[in-house]
Amino acid sequence: MRHWYDQAIIYQIYPKSFQDSNGDGIGDLNGIRKRIPYLKELGVNAVWLNPVFVSPQVDNGYDVSNYFAIDPKMGTMEDMDNLIKEMHGAGIHVIMDFVLNHTSDQHPWFQDAIKNPDSIYRDYYIFAGQNNQRPNNWGSFFGGSVWEKDPAETGQFYFHLFDKRMPDLNWKNPEVRHAMSEIAKYWLEKGIDGLRLDAFIHIAKADLRQNFPVNSKAEEPVVAEPFFANLPQVQKWMRPFCEEIKQDYPDALLLGEAASANVNLAVDYTNKDNHLMDSVITFRYFTEDQSQVDPSFSAQYQPKSLDLVKFKQNQAVWQQTLSGVSKPTLYWNNHDMARIATRIAKNDIQARSLAMLMYLQNGLPIIYYGEELGMKNLEFEDVTQFEDETVKEFIESAKKAGKTSQEALLMVSKTHKLPARGPMPWNNAKNKGFSDGKPWLKGKKVDHANAADEIADSHSMFNFYRKLISLKKEALFEDGGYYLLPTSNDSYVYERNLEDQKALVAVSL
């Protein structure tokens, strides 16, 4: 059975940064509606919206306090209904980002859990430990321990894999699994066409009594990823969730974020016999070249080039292993990493080459907003703009190694995910047409390229992407076989074939 998403070309919209319609400096749903003609001209047939639910915005919407309402900064439910209707009218499907591993600490479930020791919602989260002793030495992805003291002063702690204001849900509890399923079906009933399942690989945790073994005697928390990523229970709990959705909405796309999943796990997650997801987004494509890293200070935010040899190996493995199972996702950047024009491409020609290389392979393209204009990361002027303790630590480390504050700050601007979320440049008007007010995120450099100029220039990056997308829609590039040819390290050549058709895609890097 064919589904619409078998031919999907997805455009990722970071709503806060796409288009502001009311002058508050924050992009919103009505701003997105205004730009539907632009999306149609580009040629995409689906959009993925980063979270637009009610949120305190601790983590830019990934901390949800109400799944059944639109954040007032984004608009209203009526705006959302109109957006869905107008997108569909333009032949564009709508995919929503669904945060299902955790909620905001302001969510009514968590608030009740910490105010009432007998609350049924206490078991919606993971509380453990006693006598003010943490259960284990596991570390959070956002730094520090995964354990935060229970505000109710019970002597226990609650589990948070990300920010302490984003407590993890207890997926062992069938009531939690049912509640999340009901939320998903609510939005699908409203007319959306699919869900990106955020951080689903983390919903299962190992035995909380188990410390992660380390060589050091230090008591610093350690990111014990094997204990909370891709555990077998993930599939056990996600299967009924996915089956229920597919039973009621058989044409809904379920796109899982499986950041650390290897290709064999991707097969498990997307094999149709397993009744799970249709495709997954992995972060395993991009192996960085560590050879130029300065060993005298932290490597975390030092710019690193792409290891092209390992990239080719990774692509060949993912293409061949998933062949006949599911379509891989094809992308160069998203909201969790620096932009391709900053991170990898050395110039405009290389950016185009990389786009062609990636998107004409077998799979589902996901184009990050502004990528089609050659957008780069913003350059921040102050460390406080990052709101990230790891950045402060990196800059101090770099300064001790002889770097100036500005040199270190520039490194972080080129590698951190936040500067990749800058406002979309639409034209040459105030704030590049993004907003009449002060944009929520600014840097000292703004891209010279803007959508209006790019559309008017037949040789622009935008028009290159438009032609590339049109080419991708041909059956040969949608459904054809794939074979990566052996070539030198600085070239990337593959063949696509379908019946009597054949194409050779050759890129010099």
Q: Could you tell me what each predicted segment is?
A:
Residues G23-I26, T342-A345, E381:
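Short, solvent-exposed loop/turn segments at secondary-structure boundaries
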